Amino acid sequence: MESRVIVDAFFRENSLVKHHIDSYDDFVENKIQGIIDEVTGVETEIKGGYKVSFGKVRVTKPINKEADGSVKEITPMEARIRNLAYSAPLYLEMIPLIGEGDEEKTLSPIEVYIGELPVMLGAKICHLSGKSEEDMINYGEDPKDPLGYFIVNGSEKAVVAQEDLIPNRILCEKVEKNNKIVDIAKVFSTRHGFRALCTVERSPDGLLNVSFPGMPSTIPLVILMRALGAESDREIMELISDEPTVVMQLVANLQEAREEHGINTTEDALEHIGKRVAPGQPKEYKLKRAETILCNYLLPHMGIESEKLGAKCKYLGRMAKNSIELYLGSRVEDDKDHYANKRLKLAGDLMEDLFRHSFNQLIKDIKYQLERQAIRNKEPSIQAAVRSDVLTERMRHAMATGNWVGGRTGVSQLLDRTSYLATVSQLRRVVSPLSRSQPHFEARDLHATQWGKICPSETPEGPNCGLVKNLAVMCKVTTDEEDEGIIQLIKEIGLSKDI
């Protein structure tokens, strides 16, 4: 009997969908403003200069605009019965800037309605948040309903957690290419929704090559490190390793850069990259384009400022060392199925991806509308330029169909109301992105590190076996923290950070 009291107390504090609700609350309170702060604003081509910068965003409780123009609060049950969306309006502070250069003048800020945000039942901005069982009954809800889902066009939609490989961590593996074994160190470098796969490969002939987005083909590691500021052979070796066995593996790479490519300085290396990314262009443009590629596409999680190139060079050295050690046998392959090498994208993270994409489309539309006003010799008006349907419809369409940003399908699903257990099971489901038609024996197997995190028995039969999983009943999922805040805290308490 006492154990029952303890279990009840635990689930009063930690509901079965707490992971999704916490993630969504974090999205509303922090991530939306973060996405808006990432954007510099709206830059137009209007003669005389006209820009718009963004301020604070405001999200209210769910409301509905009636046919007669009146606005009133909407409850989840009303949204179900009337086939409406349970969503909250978004208001964004916009600051117009008129003129160019020193003559630029800042006008007073305007708060503009930019669209509707789908609201998760049970979240802080939901009318049901913190309500007692009696209040839930008055709202027409089942007091035992787990919540944690959305209502779109009257249909209940559950957003299913997606399993992904860990971002921003070096993983080592051996891969067979052309009947030969290649030793690879790779990292899924992720920053503000942009995911770049950067790899350092050690080929069977001992040469190290790097691949990353923005480069049409692989580039020798030594050339790339020279472009990032490590000019001398000694400097490159020191950045990789001081172990004699590892250093011996670098000799062929240093000779290749000097003898085959004739690259001895940072400028030579930048020009070599420039020839690949901007062929046939003047030298100055090539150098500038090469630096832009290195800043924006090489290891973007470390920063996109030119001051971060030295840190990126150190990081590449670490990746090169790992791939050489993997070849020498002093390092083992990373286990991709180890749960420390996995991360879950919960409702808030998936909504963040969707909102970022929808908001960028809204910015493009605002720019187009402002420029069209100028062509028609009208005074630019922000209120007239913002078409709230752009953001609203993109988000609602994704929620209704399950077709998400990045080509993912089945992210949102119709809530299974077959039974209470079926509903809870769906809200605690975890889906792997791996293809159902491939064997993937290791990925489907039960891994020892899933103990206490993933239910060992609840997985479907057939092609989804082992790829569709469920969280263990007392599993907790923490929300992600931004690296910048952690690094700042480390500095404040007096610790140093080399990279």
Swiss-Prot record:
Highest taxon listed in the record's lineage: Archaea
Coiled-coil regions, chain positions: none
Pfam families in alphabetical order: RNA_pol_Rpb2_1, RNA_pol_Rpb2_2, RNA_pol_Rpb2_3
Catalytic reaction equation(s): RNA(n) + a ribonucleoside 5'-triphosphate = RNA(n+1) + diphosphate
Name of the top EC class for this enzyme: transferase
Keyword check for Transferase: yes
EC number: 2.7.7.6
GO cellular component: cytoplasm; DNA-directed RNA polymerase complex
GO MF terms, alphabetically ordered: DNA binding; DNA-directed RNA polymerase activity; ribonucleoside binding
Compartments, record wording: Cytoplasm
Keywords: Cytoplasm, DNA-binding, DNA-directed RNA polymerase, Nucleotidyltransferase, Transcription, Transferase
GO BP, sorted A to Z: DNA-templated transcription
Main localization, broad class: cytoplasm
Purpose: DNA-dependent RNA polymerase (RNAP) catalyzes the transcription of DNA into RNA using the four ribonucleoside triphosphates as substrates. The Rpo2 subunit (Rpo2N and Rpo2C in this organism) is implicated in DNA promoter recognition and in nucleotide binding.
Annotated family: Belongs to the RNA polymerase beta chain family.
Quaternary structure annotation from Swiss-Prot or TrEMBL: Part of the RNA polymerase complex.
Name of the protein in its database record: DNA-directed RNA polymerase subunit Rpo2N
Naturally occurring in which organism (per UniProt): Methanococcus vannielii (strain ATCC 35089 / DSM 1224 / JCM 13029 / OCM 148 / SB)
